[in-house]
C-alpha cells in the first residue's frame, strides 16, 4: 500500500512542478497559482504519507518525523566510539534537532556525551574524522556558554594551524589522512574550523580553513561534472556504464559541509565566494541527478547499477538544497519541488517504529543497499534535512 501511495505522490509532485514552470513564465499569476499549488500538495501529501510517520507536510508534521527517528536512535545503542565520525555526524544532526525540539532531553543527551569524553576529540591529531564531534561541542558551547566545552578543540586546532601537515593529497600511505585528501573530510573537519572561527573570531582558524579547502577542491573537484571524486584512487575508475565514479554519500558529505561552512562564515567574509561558487555549481548538478522517486543513489552517474534508495546521500542533499532556499541562494520555483520530493522519499524510508532504512554501510564508494540497512550517520543526515524543512515550512 505504501509503495502505491508513494507512486501517486510522485505523480502529483510532477504536476506540482508543471505549475511552477507555468509560474516562471506567467509572473502575474504567481501568487494565486502558488497558493493553489501548495493546497494541492498538502492535500496529496496528507492522503499519501505513512500515517505512522508524519501526518502532513507541515512544520509540526516534520518535527513529529524527526522526533520519531531521533528517539529510535537514542533507544538503540551503537557500538562506535562516541568520538568517531559516525557519531559526530549523528550528533551534528541531533544538535539541530535539539534546537527545535522544545525540551531539554536532547541537549542533555548530547551534554552527557561531552562529559563522558571530557570534551575531547578523537585520538588522531590530524585526522578529519576525529574532529567531526567538534560540531556538537560548538553547539553545546553556544547553548551553555561554557568554554571548557570547546577548549580541547581549540587546543587541537591551534596546534594544527601552527604545525600543519606537509603531506601531499594523494590518498596513499600511512599519513594519507593527515590532510583533507578524501571528500568526506569536508563535512568532518572544515565545518568545525568554520564554527570555531565563528565563535572566536580568530583568523588563524579561517586562514587554515581557506587554505586547506582550496587545496582539496583543486585536487578532487571535477570542474566538468561539478562533483568531487572520493579520493585520488577514483581518478581513473569508471562505472559499468562508462561514466566516472562519483559516490552519492561522498558528495553528500561535501554538500552538507559547504552548507554548514557558509552558515558559519560572515556574509562579508573575504573568501566567501569561493565556497558559494562550488555550492551553487553542485546544487544545480545534484538537482539534475535526483531520481523520479525523490531519492539520490549510491552512484550519482550510474543509478541503474545501484537502483535502490540511499538515504544518507538523500538526506544530505535534501538538507543542502533546503538550506539554499532558506538562505536565498536557490530559487524556490526550481528547487522547492525537488526538496519536497526528497523529504517525501526520506519519510517513506522510515519504519513505523522510527528506524531509518536504506542507509549504505560504511565504505568509500557506491555499494548495494537493502531496506533494513541503517547507520547512525544516516540519522544525522535525516535530522539535518528535517531542521531545514522546519525552517522552510515556517516561512
For the regions a protein language model found, what residue spans apply to each?
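Extended ligand-binding groove/face enriched in aromatic
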Residues: 102, 107-111, 119-235, 240-244, ...
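Short, Lys/Arg-enriched N-terminal segments with co-localized hydrophobic residues
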Residues: 10-22
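Extended ligand-binding clefts on enzyme/binding-domain cores
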Residues: 183-187, 191-300, 307-318, 330-359, ...
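CBM-like carbohydrate-recognition segments
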Residues: 50-88, 97-116, 120-152, 156-159, ...
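Bacterial N-terminal signal peptides that target proteins for export
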Residues: 5, 22-35
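Bacterial N-terminal signal peptides
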Residues: 34-44
Amino acid at each position: 500500500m505504501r509503495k502505491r501511495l508513494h507512486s501517486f505522490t510522485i505523480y502529483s509532485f510532477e504536476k506540482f512542478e508543471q505549475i511552477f514552470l507555468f509560474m516562471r513564465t506567467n509572473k502575474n499569476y504567481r501568487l494565486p497559482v502558488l497558493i493553489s499549488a501548495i493546497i494541492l500538495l498538502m492535500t496529496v501529501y496528507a492522503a499519501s504519507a505513512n500515517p505512522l510517520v508524519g501526518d502532513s507536510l507541515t512544520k509540526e508534521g516534520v518535527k513529529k518525523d524527526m522526533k520519531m527517528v531521533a528517539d529510535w536512535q537514542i533507544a538503540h545503542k551503537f557500538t562506535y566510539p562516541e568520538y568517531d565520525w559516525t557519531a559526530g555526524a549523528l550528533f551534528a544532526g541531533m544538535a539541530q534537532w535539539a534546537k527545535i525540539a522544545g525540551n531539554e532531553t536532547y541537549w542533555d543527551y548530547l551534554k552527557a556525551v561531552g562529559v563522558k569524553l571530557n570534551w575531547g576529540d578523537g585520538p588522531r591529531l590530524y585526522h578529519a574524522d576525529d574532529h567531526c564531534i567538534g560540531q556538537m561541542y560548538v553547539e553545546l558551547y553556544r547553548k551553555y556558554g561554557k568554554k571548557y566545552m570547546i577548549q580541547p578543540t581549540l587546543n587541537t586546532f591551534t596546534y594544527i594551524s601552527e604545525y600543519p601537515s606537509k603531506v601531499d593529497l594523494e590518498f596513499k600511505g600511512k599519513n594519507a589522512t593527515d590532510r583533507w585528501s578524501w571528500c568526506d573530510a569536508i563535512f568532518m573537519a572544515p565545518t568545525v574550523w568554520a564554527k570555531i572561527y565563528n565563535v572566536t573570531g580568530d583568523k588563524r582558524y579561517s586562514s587554515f580553513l581557506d587554505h586547506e579547502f582550496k587545496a582539496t577542491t583543486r585536487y578532487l573537484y571535477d570542474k566538468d561534472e561539478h562533483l568531487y571524486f572520493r579520493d585520488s584512487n577514483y581518478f581513473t575508475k569508471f562505472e559499468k556504464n562508462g561514466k566516472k565514479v562519483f559516490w552519492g554519500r561522498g558528495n553528500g558529505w561535501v554538500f552538507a559541509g559547504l552548507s554548514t561552512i557558509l552558515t558559519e562564515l560572515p556574509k562579508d567574509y573575504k573568501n566567501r565566494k569561493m565556497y558559494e561558487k562550488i555550492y551553487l555549481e553542485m546544487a544545480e548538478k545534484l538537482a539534475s541527478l535526483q531520481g523520479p522517486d525523490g531519492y539520490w543513489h549510491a552512484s550519482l552517474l550510474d543509478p541503474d547499477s545501484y537502483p535502490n534508495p540511499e538515504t544518507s546521500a538523500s538526506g544530505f542533499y535534501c538538507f543542502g538544497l533546503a538550506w539554499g532556499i532558506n538562505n536565498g541562494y536557490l530559487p524556490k520555483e526550481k528547487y522547492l519541488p525537488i526538496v519536497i520530493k526528497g523529504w517525501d522519499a526520506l519519510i517513506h524510508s522510515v519504519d513505523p517504529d522510527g528506524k531509518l532504512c536504506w542507509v549504505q554501510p560504511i565504505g568509500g564508494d557506491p555499494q548495494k543497499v537493502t531496506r533494513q540497512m541503517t547507520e547512525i550517520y544516516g540519522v544525522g543526515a535525516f535530522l539535518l534535512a528535517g531542521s531545514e524543512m522546519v525552517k522552510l515550512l515556517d516561512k
